[in-house]
From Swiss-Prot:
<keyword id="KW-0963">Cytoplasm</keyword>
<dbReference type="GO" id="GO:0043022">
    <property type="term" value="F:ribosome binding"/>
</dbReference>
<dbReference type="InterPro" id="IPR046357">
    <property type="entry name" value="PPIase_dom_sf"/>
</dbReference>
<dbReference type="GO" id="GO:0051301">
    <property type="term" value="P:cell division"/>
</dbReference>
<dbReference type="GO" id="GO:0043335">
    <property type="term" value="P:protein unfolding"/>
</dbReference>
<dbReference type="Pfam" id="PF05698">
    <property type="entry name" value="Trigger_C"/>
</dbReference>
<dbReference type="InterPro" id="IPR005215">
    <property type="entry name" value="Trig_fac"/>
</dbReference>
<dbReference type="GO" id="GO:0051083">
    <property type="term" value="P:'de novo' cotranslational protein folding"/>
</dbReference>
<keyword id="KW-0131">Cell cycle</keyword>
<dbReference type="InterPro" id="IPR001179">
    <property type="entry name" value="PPIase_FKBP_dom"/>
</dbReference>
<dbReference type="Pfam" id="PF05697">
    <property type="entry name" value="Trigger_N"/>
</dbReference>
<feature type="domain" description="PPIase FKBP-type">
    <location>
        <begin position="161"/>
        <end position="246"/>
    </location>
</feature>
<keyword id="KW-0697">Rotamase</keyword>
<comment type="function">
    <text>Involved in protein export. Acts as a chaperone by maintaining the newly synthesized protein in an open conformation. Functions as a peptidyl-prolyl cis-trans isomerase.</text>
</comment>
<dbReference type="GO" id="GO:0061077">
    <property type="term" value="P:chaperone-mediated protein folding"/>
</dbReference>
<protein>
    <recommendedName>
        <fullName>Trigger factor</fullName>
        <ecNumber>5.2.1.8</ecNumber>
    </recommendedName>
</protein>
<keyword id="KW-0132">Cell division</keyword>
Length: 444
């Protein structure tokens, strides 16, 4: 086998590989001989078909199979010979496949970058702490009450938290636009499910009233023709409903799995869940800071093929979420056309870069999966189910799930390593701040 390696641009490599014709011819002859023992052709007994007939009937197909196998095998042999680490699948371009002549093909592919992780000591991280107070528990219980509340019509002006039934018609430059009209739409004021300014304009209206609300569409609105555009909505309120909160009694507690122990047990369960949520959120904030620090401190050449694969994974994830949310309405949608690559490119590049950096740290520091940490992570998940032991057994019996937990454990171990070298300061925040997503905090 002859191999020629060329570095084209950046991480791209081009391998020209030659395979002796004899290697292919011998394998074709071997497979045809094996096939002759079992093929059935009219006019011949099984195993007695002449090789010339077998060659005529099956030779071309067998040769194609052998060529495919030989090219695939010789590519990876060449990669090992040149000590390369391909990232993604190669693009194979056959140059010479004629029978009787040496085979030649060109494989174009990317390799993993050489990474030297540095700057861990310069990473600055704030380790947040928070306490779940009695007031936090009261607020959470009120939220749970609202989730089970009944709605009753009111004659007063609408306020935040009310549910309204509205008709509206939107215009831009005096012209109606697609999707800007609806009748009998239910909306909870303060849910932020409409564009900014729309719900605020309805607050203070009574049933039967009509108002014109002026709004400006966000610059990142999904419909390109409306991005940043000013519009007017003529809104008529059909109905205003206020919430009627349920009493804190055994019937209410039972809806959340508390069948004995009354309010004391209910409050204890709520606090326990809040503590769990708080710890998860604080761990997430810490990890995010560490990962941001790693990306900022290390510039990495990113293989385009890995980014492309990550984009596809992110798009599929969002597509699955849309399928779950919209059901049959989302069937047949070409997600690639409505969810373009640019939507996910930045996130995909970051994820690939982080994956490469974390993998390099694991390799350099010789970090192996902490089995006790894996066990702890699985037990944390299992504790939220009615039969924890069944969940634990299920995880350990599912190779894919277990692999995901082991990957998460490795990430936690890397975070711990970085924290041991980084500049860490402590800060106490409220429970509300602790559980609030980072993106939402940034907006505020």
């Amino acid at each position: 086998m002859q191999v020629s390696l060329e570095t084209t641009t950046g991480l791209e490599r081009k391998l020209t590989v030659g395979i002796p014709a004899s290697v292919v011819d011998q394998e074709v002859a071997k497979r045809l001989k094996e096939a002759a023992k079992t093929v059935r052709i009219n006019g011949f007994r099984k195993g007695k078909v002449p090789m010339s007939v077998v060659q005529q009937r099956y030779g071309a197909g067998v040769r194609q199979e052998v060529l495919g196998d030989a090219i695939n095998r010789s590519f990876y042999d060449a990669v090992r010979k040149e000590s390369l680490r391909p990232a993604g699948q190669p693009a194979i371009e056959p140059k010479q496949l004629e029978p009787g002549k040496d085979i030649e093909f060109v494989a174009t592919f990317e390799v993993y970058p050489e990474i030297e992780v540095s700057g861990l000591e310069s990473i600055e991280v704030t380790r947040y702490n928070a306490e779940v107070t009695d007031a936090d528990v009261d607020t959470m219980i009120e939220t749970l009450q609202k989730s089970q509340a009944d709605w009753a019509p009111v004659k007063r002006k609408s306020k935040k938290g009310d549910r309204v039934v509205i008709d509206f018609k939107g215009t831009k430059d005096g012209e109606a636009f697609e999707g800007g009209t609806a009748e009998g739409q239910t909306l909870v004021l303060g849910s932020n499910s409409m564009i900014p300014g729309f719900e605020k304009g309805i607050i203070g209206m009574k049933a039967g009233e009509t108002e014109t609300i002026k709004v400006t569409f966000p610059d990142d609105y999904q419909e390109e023709s409306l991005r940043g555009a000013e519009a007017e909505f003529e809104v008529t309120v059909q109905k205003v409903e206020g919430q009627k909160l349920p009493k804190l009694d055994d019937e209410f507690f039972a809806k959340f799995g508390v069948t004995e122990g009354g309010e004391e047990k209910f409050r204890a369960d709520v606090r326990e869940n809040m503590e769990r949520e708080k710890q998860k959120a604080l761990k997430g904030k810490l990890k995010e800071q560490v990962m941001n620090g790693l990306v900022a401190a290390n510039t990495v050449d990113i293989p385009k093929s890995l980014v492309s694969g990550e984009i596809d994974a992110l798009r599929n994830q969002m597509g699955n979420q849309m399928m779950q949310q919209y059901g049959s309405q989302a069937e047949g949608i070409d997600f690639k056309s409505i969810l373009p690559d640019d939507m996910f490119k930045e996130q995909a590049e970051r994820r690939v870069a982080l994956g490469l950096i974390v993998s390099e740290i694991v390799k350099n520091e010789k970090i192996s999966v902490d089995k006790e940490l894996v066990k702890s992570l699985i037990e944390d998940v299992a504790s939220t189910y009615e039969h924890p032991e069944e969940v634990v057994n299920y995880y350990y019996g599912n190779e894919q799930l277990l692999g995901g937990v082991e990957a998460a454990a490795l990430e936690e171990q890397v975070v711990s390593l970085v924290l041991s070298k980084a500049k860490v300061s402590d800060e106490t925040i409220s429970y509300e701040e602790a559980v609030k997503p980072a993106a939402k905090q940034a907006e505020e």
